[in-house]
């Protein structure tokens, strides 16, 4: 029987790891879309992920019908699983089934890129749409004000923390780490906007940046798609210019 020991598992590893470099695959600069796939920092981040795979540190999900094996954490077979806190925001009897004994489970922020000038962190965006002609736009404004206030209101935070202790079985160490991750994220938040582009170019970029993590050389992958990506980004920027005129 093969003894399995894995450093990293999961589906959501690629973007947090390369965003730590401080460079997303695509960014918005001066109102225009910019392709960063050839940026040296981004290329280095892609090479890092390729090296993780080449050194056998990533779970080969193809051996498990493309399903992460989170239970390996509880079994002591793997170390890290990049995900959201929702994985442990439920009753302890639920999340301990896969992650192991309550006292043995902890989370940490994605490590800082030692070559980056700052500690950049993958930030999620909470967005709300207001339909044209909505009957009560002022109500939407009040809702947004309440949501924003809830992020900083001490009483709201205290209630949330107590819920994490009482309902989710969190320790004070976990609460402190949640605060630390929030602090890091707020200092230098970074988001890749590739997913917000047209479906064709978005899929092309997303598929490409996933390749090094799966064991394919980034420079070869980039060469195969870069011209097409640049062409489509140029078309998007042209449309932006037309809308401005």
Regions found by a protein language model. Give the residues of each.
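A ligand-binding cleft/hinge motif common to bilobed small-molecule-binding domains
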Residues: 85-100
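Short helix-initiation/N-cap motifs at beta->coil->alpha
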Residues: 61-74
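Non-transmembrane alpha-helical segments in soluble domains
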Residues: 46-54, 70, 140-148
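Glycine-centered hinge/linker elements that transmit conformational signals in sensory
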Residues: 28-63
């Amino acid at each position: 029987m093969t003894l399995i020991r894995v450093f990293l598992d999961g589906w959501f590893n690629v973007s947090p790891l390369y965003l730590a470099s401080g460079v997303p695959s695509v960014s918005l600069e001066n109102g225009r879309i910019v392709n960063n796939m050839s940026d040296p920092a981004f290329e280095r981040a892609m090479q890092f992920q390729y090296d993780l795979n080449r050194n056998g540190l990533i779970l080969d999900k193809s051996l498990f019908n493309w399903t992460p094996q989170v239970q390996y954490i509880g079994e002591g077979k793997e170390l890290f699983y990049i995900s959201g806190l929702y994985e442990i925001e439920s009753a302890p009897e639920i999340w301990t089934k896969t992650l192991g004994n309550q006292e043995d489970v902890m989370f940490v922020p994605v490590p800082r890129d030692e070559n980056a000038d700052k500690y950049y962190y993958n930030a999620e965006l909470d967005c709300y749409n207001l339909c044209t002609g909505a009957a009560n736009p002022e109500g939407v404004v009040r809702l947004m004000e309440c949501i924003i206030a809830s992020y900083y209101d001490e009483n709201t935070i205290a209630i949330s923390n107590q819920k994490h202790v009482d309902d989710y079985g969190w320790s004070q160490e976990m609460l402190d780490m949640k605060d630390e991750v929030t602090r890091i994220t707020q200092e230098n938040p970074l988001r890749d906007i590739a997913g917000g582009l047209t479906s064709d170019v978005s899929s092309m970029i997303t598929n490409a940046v996933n390749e090094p993590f799966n064991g394919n050389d980034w420079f070869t992958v980039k060469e195969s798609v870069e011209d097409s990506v640049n062409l489509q980004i140029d078309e998007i920027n042209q449309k932006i210019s037309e809308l401005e005129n």
